[in-house]
């Protein structure tokens, strides 16, 4: 933690003098307790003197400067100088010691400068100052009258560049070691030398050293002795006998890149190209040409030769048609079986509607009580990730071993001001008043308090995270840490004397004059070196929590440096290891958010942005409540449209109340309630089995199920209305026959479509994505229950309402009744379906669509469109923009925008090793450590490589490797791990026992490792702890806080990084680093980050070659894991859906293979068209869009099955004519019914504030509806016209092709034969209606002849309806039916 201090103390060793070869010698000027200026040896060079071998510093000189101790051991430094030099070189080992060669070169630099007997050859004094007497201190060199203040140190470029080359790739804490020794990024040799030569007494650097570089090639031979040019050691070579060379990861990054190949081929694939053209594009072009050729051939064949029509003519010529094969007979049997049973159900309901009603009520009574167990999941993770998913399983393992990661609370301040024109810190936020406000905010947050359910007060101190232990403050990552949280430090002033030479120094940032901006000088120093213990301003940069504040964590920027920061970030960490801690944290966060919202309204100086861990959940709930009005309006339109569009409205007998006779207001409203009840039943059943939906999924489910139910309601009611046109008058007593006929015509299609819808939904329920799974399961069961309720409760209601209509009674006014029922019927039957939509489809759309050229052109357009959508669909992206879940005005949306724009740090990621390993064994340690002697492809080296290749791995920042720190902490040369001599089992901490750190009271732990001491010193076993010592001191390491004496203490970084078994062994451990900055609005960043992290974890697992499992975990992974597999899962499910739908339609419609194939073609095309439009409108594939694709299956099935059923029931002979009649009769029902209902209610969602609603439930759902309608009403009929099946009743009866009453929605032959047996022989199943059946009751009634003549006359001449007519209609008049015109 104290790298800079440790390194800079090294430079306090640059003091000496001599006469013959020394120009400075001894200590003369005391600046601080650890910084002494060396003595000037006047004008006479002083010869070096022999070093005393008995002095304790001699052994250290042998260790660090052995090249100087040869022969007579004459040096230019005194023993006291050498002692200070070696102590500080030893501390510099913490930073550079990972590469022994680098460290040796660095030691040579300062050994030569301080102690070389040839010092006068390459060191010159530039500035000296008179010695000032200090009490208690006597200069070591008595003749000296001045001390050295500035020197010039001449180096050869060979040594300087060789030293820099050996050190440039050395890492410290996962980052380049030179980064803490150099203010520029990247660090260059010149900048490095200038920085380490800068004078700073507060950092114990007593003199200013100017490095001058000389090129040996360009320097004359006579001058080559004027610069220091000792031999350097390359990083790939051993510096000393017994020392290892630097590891490849610390020496040659280019070579190391060839050793470690992270890509295992599972995260990227090669793109197929032929001469630069994508293979997919080539394929679709060929497919288009082939499809176009097939279409033209088929069009030619079917326009010149109609097999069905020829067979009909042959049959009419007396030729006997071939006997149906077994498949056709089976299909006919299925067809008749379903119609007959449907008719029986309808007739039973017509006779006894109460029984059906009570059966439906029994279903409700069985299902609805389960609602008492109903609850919605409000956990955001549960909404997006399955508990069985890999990320959630790994999260459970991680939490079980290390506890939950801390909760984050964030505040961001942005300045209204512009950049400053001058100054060290010129960013808009570097104003004193802004930092004063920041301190006020922090103090207010610390005073936030709330109470739990027991009345106990909860403050930040009760919930915050303290990495250094109870004796330290909460971890609040903020620039206030640079001032130790003390606002008064902003008023500090500097009055220090000038200590720097007159020459300007680019690295001396601090002014020595008294200034009110001294706080800014101090902050600038902390931004450059955040781990500095003491800046020139006299303050530490360390926070009161015990650690540094990295500039990229506390300052936001959109430039290349933090001096230009335009935002300030404050991050507060809160613990959540246990459920009580989570509850306390959430209570405090609630008050925290309340404070922030209030403060935002009254912060004129800054732009205030914030969020807490619970913010996302809270805002989703709040925004959902705000959108209730929008959803209610949409549902109100849905209910209103269904209620009023089912009926017919015209006045009879000049009575205004008669307008409600043919209305269906109550039936429409109750049908919607039935749909609602079916949803409740689904909820109840699944709740009983413990399957609970995610938040707000039920609203979507109710919406979808209601829309599908509306389709069935319209088909039943409109089918009845159409049949009334072609039926003679039937009395109320014949209601069972009417209902039976309606059920026979609609229930088979209803059953088929419902089964197909439920199947497509249930297939979606097999996914592990909770949002899709729960929606699909609930919707699938609701669809089936809705069918049951339609066949029971709705059917009973339909019977009662039909009886009311047949009796001429208006809704809501039951005492009233139309007297002339027959007169009302004769006009009403004409206006039953002859609306504008019916006429438009019957006379305009259907003939035009079935025209030969129209079909061919439409087919070509369809194929071209399909091919285009395939290409566009291949480019669709996956993901979800988090900001879309909130309104534009939400404080989270604002905060997300600022994070994207200014914040430069990604989320943490933990590489976890799960499994019990023998960590005490050196061979296992070598698989994880990174210093010399460890494997080049060790776990730690791979991690360092991954962190260093950010663009490939999306990893960045420091890598926390506990095994490295522990082995450094317990090593023989480390001052960290010591035990008492009198009690070797008692740990002697550097924090608790400052007076006992000498060898007399405490000695290193390894001195008492008798097992390790039994090995030779050259053996690795000698330098590594034995099993007993390893595990005994591991817990001491985890409790040891880092300090200036020992930077390797593990409490701050590794306290929660290791999980132990009951035997004290390591069960699991984690190695933390960070992702690079990930764009919140670009989910592909998060997806790639997760994929690459897992790629790295797979490589790490191979590196340890053991039974342990390695996985990467981050809090973001459960949210984004779905996107790695959503495309193959969705594709598989849609494929299964298509296959299943084909089978269901084929079987339930009487083995209609051709019709099912046409429906499947439309289904597949519909998928591609929706996905293509998603690409055009920039809507990625995610759980919401996937849900829309599943819904599109249900909607298109509902439409298609009715079209196929109408086509199969048509009595026309040619395929084109059957398709035309289907469009004319089914088209207006579908378009005016479910399509208008869906589209109309969806349009109201466009006014929602939530982008998630406007995009996924307005824009995308509208695309789904329109695409499904186009495929069902245009594409499917055209496909059927090219070659659909003939149905199961078309060959049994030969009729006139032009008889429109025998189109798709007329009675089937079986239905007609059944009704022909009805009492009084009202229907005798003629090909044309017999007028006598209509006129007979009129002729027998009083005045009936006149009325009949009036009606016939009116309908022939098309005049305006006279006032004498019993019924007047508001609807436009249409042509009279053929049977009436024949009168």
Swiss-Prot record:
Catalytic activity entry: cholesterol(in) = cholesterol(out)
Disulphide-bonded residues: 22-76, 28-39, 65-111, 77-115, 99-246, 102-167, 182-187, 235-251, 464-474, 526-541, 929-934, 976-1046, 977-1005, 988-1002
GO cellular component terms listed in the entry, alphabetical order: late endosome; lysosome; plasma membrane
One BP annotation, GO: intestinal cholesterol absorption
Gene Ontology molecular functions: cholesterol binding
Keywords attached to this entry: Developmental protein, Disulfide bond, Glycoprotein, Lipid transport, Membrane, Signal, Transmembrane, Transmembrane helix, Transport
Mutant lacking the gene: phenotype: Both ncr-1 single mutant and ncr-1 and ncr-2 double mutants exhibit slow embryonic and larval development, and hyperactive egg-laying behavior (egg-laying constitutive (egl-c) phenotype). Ncr-1 and ncr-2 double mutants inappropriately and transiently form dauer larvae under favorable conditions (dauer-constitutive (daf-c) phenotype).
SSD domain span: 627-800
Bilayer-crossing regions: 282-302, 353-373, 627-647, 665-685, 697-717, 746-766, 780-800, 856-876, 1126-1146, 1157-1177, 1179-1199, 1226-1246, 1260-1280
Cellular location(s): Membrane
Source species, domain of life: Eukaryota
Signal peptide: 1-20
Functional description taken from the UniProt entry: Involved in the uptake or utilization of cholesterol. Ncr-1 and ncr-2 act redundantly to prevent dauer larva formation under favorable growth conditions, and are required for the normal functioning of ADF, ASI and ASG neurons.
Family: Belongs to the patched family.
Designated name of the protein: NPC intracellular cholesterol transporter 1 homolog 1
Taxonomic lineage of the native organism: Eukaryota, Metazoa, Ecdysozoa, Nematoda, Chromadorea
């Amino acid at each position: 933690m104290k790298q800079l201090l440790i390194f800079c103390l090294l430079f306090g060793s640059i003091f000496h003098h001599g006469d013959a070869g020394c120009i400075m010698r001894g200590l003369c000027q005391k600046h601080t307790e650890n910084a002494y200026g060396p003595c000037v040896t006047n004008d006479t060079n002083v010869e070096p003197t022999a070093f005393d071998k008995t002095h304790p510093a001699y052994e250290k000189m042998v260790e660090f400067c052995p090249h100087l101790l040869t022969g007579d051991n004459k040096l230019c430094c005194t023993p006291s100088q050498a002692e200070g030099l070696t102590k500080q070189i030893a501390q510099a080992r913490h930073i550079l010691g990972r590469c022994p060669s680098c460290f040796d070169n660095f030691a040579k630099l300062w050994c030569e400068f301080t102690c070389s007997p040839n010092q006068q050859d390459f060191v010159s004094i530039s500035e000296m100052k008179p010695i000032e007497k200090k009490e208690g201190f006597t200069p070591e060199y008595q003749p000296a009258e001045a001390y050295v203040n500035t020197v010039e140190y001449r180096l050869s470029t060979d040594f300087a560049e060789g030293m820099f080359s050996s050190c440039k790739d050395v890492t410290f804490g996962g980052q380049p070691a030179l980064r803490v020794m150099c203010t520029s990024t990247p660090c260059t040799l010149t900048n490095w030398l200038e920085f380490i030569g800068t004078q700073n007494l507060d950092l114990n650097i007593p003199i200013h050293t100017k490095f001058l570089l000389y090129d040996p090639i360009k320097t004359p031979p006579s001058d080559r002795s004027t610069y220091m040019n000792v031999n350097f050691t390359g990083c790939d070579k051993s510096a000393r006998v017994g020392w290892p060379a630097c590891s490849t990861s610390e020496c040659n990054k280019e070579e190391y890149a060839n050793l470690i190949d992270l890509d295992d081929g599972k995260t990227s694939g090669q793109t197929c190209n032929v001469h630069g053209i994508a293979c997919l594009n080539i394929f679709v072009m060929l497919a288009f040409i082939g499809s176009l050729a097939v279409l033209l051939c088929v069009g030619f064949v079917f326009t010149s030769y109609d097999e069905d029509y020829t067979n009909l003519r042959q049959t009419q010529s007396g030729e006997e048609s071939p006997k149906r094969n077994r498949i056709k007979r089976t299909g006919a049997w299925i067809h008749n079986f379903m119609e007959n049973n449907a008719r029986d159900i309808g007739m039973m309901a017509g006779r006894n509607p109460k029984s059906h009603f009570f059966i439906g009520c029994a279903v409700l009574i069985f299902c609805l009580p389960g609602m008492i167990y109903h609850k919605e999941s409000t956990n955001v993770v549960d909404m997006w990730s399955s508990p069985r998913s890999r990320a959630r399983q790994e999260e459970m393992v991680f939490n079980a071993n290390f506890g939950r990661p801390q909760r984050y609370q964030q505040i961001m301040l942005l300045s209204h001001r512009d950049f400053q024109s001058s100054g060290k810190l010129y960013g808009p936020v570097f104003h004193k008043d802004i930092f004063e406000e920041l301190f006020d905010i922090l103090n207010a947050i610390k005073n936030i308090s709330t109470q739990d359910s027991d009345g106990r007060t909860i403050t930040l101190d009760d919930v915050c995270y303290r990495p250094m232990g109870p004796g330290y403050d909460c971890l609040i990552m903020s620039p206030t840490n640079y001032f130790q949280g003390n606002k008064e430090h902003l008023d500090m002033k500097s009055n220090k004397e000038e200590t720097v030479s007159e020459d300007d120094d680019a690295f001396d940032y601090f002014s020595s004059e008294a200034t009110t901006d001294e706080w800014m000088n101090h902050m600038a120093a902390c931004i450059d070196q955040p781990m500095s213990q003491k800046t020139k301003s006299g303050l530490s940069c360390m926070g009161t929590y015990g650690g540094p504040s990295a500039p990229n964590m506390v300052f936001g920027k959109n430039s290349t440096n933090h001096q230009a920061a335009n935002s300030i970030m404050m991050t507060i960490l809160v613990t959540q290891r246990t459920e009580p801690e989570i509850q306390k944290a959430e209570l405090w966060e609630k008050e925290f958010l309340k404070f922030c919202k209030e403060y935002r309204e009254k912060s004129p100086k800054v732009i205030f942005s914030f969020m807490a861990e619970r913010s996302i959940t809270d805002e989703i709930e709040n925004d959902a409540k705000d959108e209730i009005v929008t959803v209610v309006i949409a549902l109100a339109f849905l209910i209103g449209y269904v209620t009023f569009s089912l009926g017919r409205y015209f006045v009879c007998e000049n009575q205004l109340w008669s307008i409600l006779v043919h209305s269906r207001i109550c039936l429409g409203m109750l049908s919607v309630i039935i749909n609602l009840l079916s949803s409740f039943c689904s909820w109840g059943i699944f709740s009983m089995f413990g399957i609970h939906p995610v938040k707000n999924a039920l609203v979507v489910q109710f919406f979808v199920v209601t829309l599908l139910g509306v389709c069935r309601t319209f088909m039943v009611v409109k089918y009845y209305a159409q049949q009334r046109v072609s039926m003679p008058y039937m009395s109320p007593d014949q209601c069972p026959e009417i209902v039976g006929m309606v059920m026979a015509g609609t229930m088979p299609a209803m059953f088929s479509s419902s089964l197909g819808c439920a199947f497509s939904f249930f297939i979606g329920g097999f996914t592990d994505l909770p949002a899709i799974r729960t929606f699909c399961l609930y919707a699938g069961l609701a669809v089936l229950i809705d069918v049951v309720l339609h066949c029971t409760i709705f059917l009973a209601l339909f019977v009662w309402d039909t009886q009311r209509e047949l009796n001429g009674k208006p809704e809501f006014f039951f005492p009233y009744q139309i007297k002339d029922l027959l007169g009302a019927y004769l006009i009403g039957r004409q206006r039953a379906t002859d609306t504008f939509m019916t006429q438009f489809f019957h006379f305009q759309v259907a003939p035009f669509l079935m025209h030969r050229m129209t079909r061919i052109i439409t087919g070509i357009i369809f194929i071209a469109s399909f091919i285009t959508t395939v290409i566009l669909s291949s480019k669709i992206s996956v993901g979800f923009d988090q900001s879309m879940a909130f309104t534009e005005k939400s404080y989270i949306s604002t905060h997300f925008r600022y994070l994207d724009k200014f914040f430069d740090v990604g989320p943490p990621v933990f590489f976890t090793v799960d499994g019990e390993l023998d960590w005490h064994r050196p061979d296992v340690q070598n698989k994880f450590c990174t210093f010399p002697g460890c494997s080049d492809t060790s776990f730690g080296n791979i991690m360092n490589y991954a962190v260093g290749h950010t663009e490939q791995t999306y990893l960045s920042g420091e890598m926390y490797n506990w095994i490295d720190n522990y082995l450094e902490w317990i090593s023989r040369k480390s001052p960290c791990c010591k035990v008492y001599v009198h009690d070797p089992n008692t740990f002697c901490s550097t924090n608790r026992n400052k007076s006992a750190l000498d060898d007399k009271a405490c000695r290193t732990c390894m001195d008492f490792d008798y097992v390790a001491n039994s090995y030779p010193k050259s053996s690795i076993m000698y330098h590594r702890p034995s099993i007993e010592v390893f595990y005994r001191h591991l817990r001491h390491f985890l409790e040891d806080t880092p300090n200036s004496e020992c930077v390797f203490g593990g409490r701050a970084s590794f306290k929660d990084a290791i999980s132990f078994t009951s035997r004290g062994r390591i069960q699991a451990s984690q190695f933390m680093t960070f992702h690079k900055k990930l764009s919140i609005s670009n989910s592909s960043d998060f997806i790639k980050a997760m994929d690459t992290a897992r790629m790295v974890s797979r490589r790490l697992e191979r590196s340890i070659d053991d039974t342990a499992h390695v996985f990467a975990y981050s809090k973001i992974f459960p949210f984004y894991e779905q996107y790695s597999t959503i495309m193959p899962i969705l594709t598989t499910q849609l494929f299964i859906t298509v296959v299943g739908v084909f089978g269901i339609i084929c079987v339930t419609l009487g083995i209609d293979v051709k019709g099912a194939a046409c429906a499947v073609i439309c289904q597949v095309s519909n998928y591609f068209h929706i996905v293509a439009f998603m690409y055009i409108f920039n809507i990625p594939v995610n759980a919401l869009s996937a849900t829309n694709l599943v819904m599109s299956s249900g909607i298109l099935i509902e439409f298609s099955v009715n079209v196929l059923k109408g086509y199969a029931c048509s009595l026309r002979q040619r395929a084109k004519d059957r398709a035309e009649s289907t469009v004319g009769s089914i088209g207006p029902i579908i378009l005016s019914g479910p399509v208008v209902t869906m589209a109309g209610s969806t349009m109201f969602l466009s006014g929602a504030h939530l982008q998630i609603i406007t995009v996924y439930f307005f824009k995308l759902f509208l695309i789904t509806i329109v695409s499904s309608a186009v495929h069902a009403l245009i594409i499917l009929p055209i496909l059927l016209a090219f070659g659909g099946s003939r149905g199961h009743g078309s060959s049994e009866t030969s009729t006139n092709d032009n008889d429109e009453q025998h189109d798709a929605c007329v009675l089937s032959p079986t239905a007609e034969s059944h009704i022909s047996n009805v009492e009084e022989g009202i229907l005798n199943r003629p090909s044309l209606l017999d007028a006598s059946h209509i006129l007979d009751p009129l002729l027998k009634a009083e005045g009936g002849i006149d009325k009949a003549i009036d009606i016939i006359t009116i309908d022939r001449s098309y005049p305006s309806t006279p006032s004498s007519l019993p019924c007047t209609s508001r609807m436009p008049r249409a042509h009279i039916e053929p049977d009436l015109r024949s009168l």
